[in-house]
Every structure is written in structure tokens, then in C-alpha cells.
């Protein structure tokens, strides 16, 4: 949850300036209480500019993020037309097969979401249960790869979507071979993650570090 909070807010954990979420379960509160101030998100930006947003997730801890930007806790929309305070239009927590099916339905509709956040829990669940890089973990990687294929194929099959959609694939942590957790910050495998971008305007073969030399 700390790194997912960073993904959607663009902020580090540590305050001041960060989102202040060190815990990995829904504590029943909201991100703004953790930070000590309102924390804007990618959902705020899209929603307040008239777009639609969705979260399709595989763990109940994401209720924390949905609650943080709901109709009660989201900030007033002060950009153009007032679209209300609920920054996340669709929130679904279920297994990956169900959430991916829902996403594919959205992509095929006449009004697909402007922004979709998709969390696939299969690899994480397998890593914690059977060990990272175990046979069960690698099987889960294959399953998730299949889900990604379905999503990318659905976008590529629609010319308008293909021309206007960018996909970012990443994860919130890694995991060392044979280990069941990722708690040791001194182990590079725990914090080494993929960051892949796909879309019409994405430079093929570009290196993330070369593109961001000052980061």
C-alpha cells in the first residue's frame, strides 16, 4: 500500500511532502489523515478535467485508496465544470479474472474510462505462499502475462484506443528467489521492479534512466 499510494499520488512516503502511508493494510482511515493534509492523485487530475476513472484491484487494502477520494473525502472540483468530489467513478475489488473481464468490457464500450488503474494480485499471492521464483510463482507470472496480453490486444484492436492510450506496467516490490517476503531493504531483488511503457507515442527501446538523468 505505501508504494501503491506513491503510484497514484506521485509522492514519496516520508512527510513533510509525502503521503505518510507506512502500513500495508486498510486502517479504516484516509490518506489525507496520514499525510496531515490533502493528497491529490492522478484520479483528481483526470476527474476534475472531465474524464472518467476506474480502479480494478485484487486486494481489500485498496478500499483505503477508494475511501480517500470518495464523495466525502475527495477535494471539491475547482477546475472548469464541477464534476463532484468523488474522484474514482468505478471501484471493483475481485479476483483478476473478474476485474480483467470488467476492464475489457469497459474498453469495448463506446465510452471507455479515461484512466484505469489495474492491480493483478496473482504473482504477489504466489510469492508469499510458495516463495518468489518458485514453480507456483512462475506459473502465476504466466497467468498475469496472459491477462496483459488480453488488455493490450483489446486496445490494439480499436484504432481510436490504440492511438490515444498509454499503458504502464510496474509493481510495488520485487522478491528474492526462495524467500516468502520482501521485508529486507538491503536486498536488491526486493526493490528492483519493472517499469514498462507501451503506446503509440512511446519511444521503442528507450531506457528509463537515460530518459530521466536527473532522477
Ranges and model annotations:
Residues 1-44, 48:
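Active-site nucleophile/metal-coordination loop of metallo-enzymes that catalyze phosphate/sulfate
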Residues 26-34, 43, 88-93, 105, ...:
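Second-shell loop/turn segments in exported
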Residues 66-84, 104-150:
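Active-site His/acidic residue clusters
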Residues 30-103, 108:
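A substrate-binding/cap region within the structured catalytic cores of diverse enzymes
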Residues 8, 185-215:
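Substrate-binding rim/cap in mid-to-C-terminal beta-strand-loop elements of soluble/periplasmic
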Amino acid at each position: 500500500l505505501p508504494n501503491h499510494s506513491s503510484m497514484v499520488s506521485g509522492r514519496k512516503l516520508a512527510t513533510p511532502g509525502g503521503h505518510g502511508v507506512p502500513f500495508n493494510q486498510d486502517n479504516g482511515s484516509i490518506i489525507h489523515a496520514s499525510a496531515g493534509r490533502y493528497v491529490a492523485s492522478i484520479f483528481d487530475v483526470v476527474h476534475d478535467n472531465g474524464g472518467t476513472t476506474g480502479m480494478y484491484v485484487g486486494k481489500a487494502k485498496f478500499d483505503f485508496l477508494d475511501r480517500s477520494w470518495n464523495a466525502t473525502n475527495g477535494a471539491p472540483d475547482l477546475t472548469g465544470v464541477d464534476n463532484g468530489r468523488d474522484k474514482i467513478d468505478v471501484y471493483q475489488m475481485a479476483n483478476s479474472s473478474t476485474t480483467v473481464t470488467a476492464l475489457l468490457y469497459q474498453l469495448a464500450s463506446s465510452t471507455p474510462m479515461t484512466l484505469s488503474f489495474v492491480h493483478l494480485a496473482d504473482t504477489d499471492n504466489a510469492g508469499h505462499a510458495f516463495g518468489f521464483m518458485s514453480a507456483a510463482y512462475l506459473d502465476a507470472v504466466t497467468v498475469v502475462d496472459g491477462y496483459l496480453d488480453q488488455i493490450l490486444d483489446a486496445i490494439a484492436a480499436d484504432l481510436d484506443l490504440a492511438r490515444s492510450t498509454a499503458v504502464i506496467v510496474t509493481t510495488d516490490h520485487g522478491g528474492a528467489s526462495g524467500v516468502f517476503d520482501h521485508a529486507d531493504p538491503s536486498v536488491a531483488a526486493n526493490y528492483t521492479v519493472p517499469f514498462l511503457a507501451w503506446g503509440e507515442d512511446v519511444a521503442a527501446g528507450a531506457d528509463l534512466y537515460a530518459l530521466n538523468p536527473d532522477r
